[in-house]
UniProtKB/Swiss-Prot annotation:
Protein's name according to its UniProt entry: LysM and putative peptidoglycan-binding domain-containing protein 1
Residues carrying Phosphoserine: 23, 33, 99, 165, 180, 193, 211
UniProt entry keywords in alphabetical sequence: Phosphoprotein
Organism: Mus musculus
InterPro entries given in the database record: LYSM1-4, LysM_dom, LysM_dom_sf
This protein's record includes keyword Phosphoprotein: yes
């Protein structure tokens, strides 16, 4: 009996099938994920160190060694230049396509000046037409008064000055009324005595010179003479 033909297993790997064996080395790059690393060439100078280069470019010393295939005991001055691995952002891998799309999206979102003007005109028409049917208008004092947010700087300052002047006038009138009312209140609260009324009628009392005051003056003169 003839043995059935052997069929090769599906997905088998080996040298006969010509498929590449999967390796897990550090230098093998996966074809599924995009390359996110670019290399920067650095010219070595006499004062350069591996730690200084790692600190300068923001990478680790192991990354520099792996990129340049240096062992731990090797000196960096065996080569004239070193390649510094720098991680690139995923946005840089698309050659600026994402940035163009984002700019287009921002331009679509931003409204134009004409649209802004038309929308403001519609709002004004709605505000004037709503709430006043049959062509009835606003009262004159409401029509002339402008909203506070529409006032300019000069109008606001003029309004402030007028309020200050009005408050000053009111304070001055209040003080005048208070001064004119004080004597009336005093006369009503404190009745004048008959002696004060007599002084008010006769005027001030003249000073009289008595004999006692004369003798005192003479004694003072004698003391000064001595």
């Amino acid at each position: 009996m003839a043995s059935p033909s052997r069929q090769p297993p599906l997905g088998g790997s080996g040298l006969l099938h010509g498929s590449r064996a999967r390796s897990y080395g550090s230098l093998v790059q996966s074809s599924c994920s995009p390359v996110r690393e670019r290399r920067l060439e650095h010219q070595l100078e006499p004062g350069d160190t591996l730690a200084g280069l790692a600190l300068k470019y923001g990478v680790t010393m192991e990354q520099i060694k792996r990129t340049n295939r240096l062992y731990t005991n090797d000196s960096i001055f065996l080569k004239k230049t070193l390649y510094i691995p720098i991680l690139s952002e995923p946005r840089d891998l698309f050659n600026g396509l994402d940035s163009e799309e984002e700019n287009d999206g921002e331009e679509e979102v931003r409204p134009s000046k004409d649209e802004i003007g038309s929308s403001s005109g519609r709002r004004k028409n709605r505000g004037s037409g709503s709430g006043r049917p049959n062509g009835t208008g606003l009262p004159p004092h409401q029509e002339t008064s402008t909203p506070s947010h529409d006032l300019s700087a000069s109008d606001f300052l003029k309004k402030l000055d007028s309020q200050i002047s009005l408050s000053k006038k009111a304070a001055a009138q209040k003080l005048r009324k208070g001064e004119s009312g004080v004597p009336e209140e005093d006369t009503g609260l404190y009745p004048s005595s008959p002696r004060m009324q007599q002084r008010a009628v006769l005027g001030p009392v003249p000073l009289t010179r008595t004999s006692r005051t004369q003798t005192l003056r003479d004694q003072e003169d004698e003391i000064f003479k001595l």
